[in-house]
Amino acid sequence: MAEITWFGHASFQVEIAKKIVLIDPWLDGNPMSPVKASEISKADIVYVTHDHGDHLGDAFNICKRTNATFVAAVELGDCAEEKGVRNVAGLNIGGSVGLLVTQALHTCARGAPTGVIIEGEGKTVYHAGDTGLFGDMRLLGELYKLDVALIPIGGYYTMGAREAAEAVRLLKPKAVIPMHYKTFPVLAQSADEFVRMVRENMPKVKVVVLKPGESYPF
């Protein structure tokens, strides 16, 4: 069985195929995170969707302490090596090292903003990264038959509830977990509107609203 744990904002731990994958591990300074970076004792892969501080977070330090492989866009991978991270895989969109890098509509200074698809144990997880809505989400859903989609809903910097609900319609996951909300005052403070829209329009999709620190086995 695979399991996803939410640390608040866009930070997740995915346990799948006997691997621990951390995504966007912004823990120290994250007002929603129930754990500190120093409490992460094991990780196999750390994936960072883009270089904004609320996503890159503690990734370098966690990789150096746990010997996890840092995976991100090429330019951000170069930065990781400069910071002393030993195991680095710098990829472009479409590239894969067991994780598939996907596009995201956002901004960043180093490399392209990305999402990621993780496969293992016959399960597939999609973390959309910080993104707006884009039509090729339909293609991702058709190609990868998603078990779980992790979707930003907070608005302002990413999709809001309406666009995120449409993303769910395009992706057609079995389950969706909302993220990237409530952390800052400018973001949506609740997932209620998103939950209502998905349940009304895609009733077959399971909406899983986690509290920080909670896990979803699948």
Label every PLM stretch briefly.
Residues 1-20, 27-30, 193-205, 209-214:
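Zn-dependent metallo-beta-lactamase
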Residues 3-6, 21-24, 99-104, 124-130:
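Active-site-proximal beta-strand elements of phosphoester/diester hydrolases
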Residues 13-52, 57-64, 75, 105-109, ...:
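Pre-active-site segment of Zn-dependent metallo-hydrolases
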Residues 22-24, 43-51, 70-74, 125-131, ...:
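Active-site neighborhood of phospho(di)ester-bond hydrolases with catalytic His/Asp-centered motifs
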Residues 29-30, 52-57, 77-80, 95-98, ...:
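Active-site environment of divalent metal-dependent phosphoester hydrolases
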Residues 49, 57-107:
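Glycine/small-residue-rich loop that forms an oxyanion/phosphate-binding "nest" at active or ligand-binding sites
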Residues 81-96, 163-165, 169-218:
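Binuclear metal-ion centers of metallo-dependent hydrolases, dominated by the metallo-beta-lactamase
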Residues 105-170, 193:
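Active-site-proximal loop/helix segments of hydrolase catalytic cores
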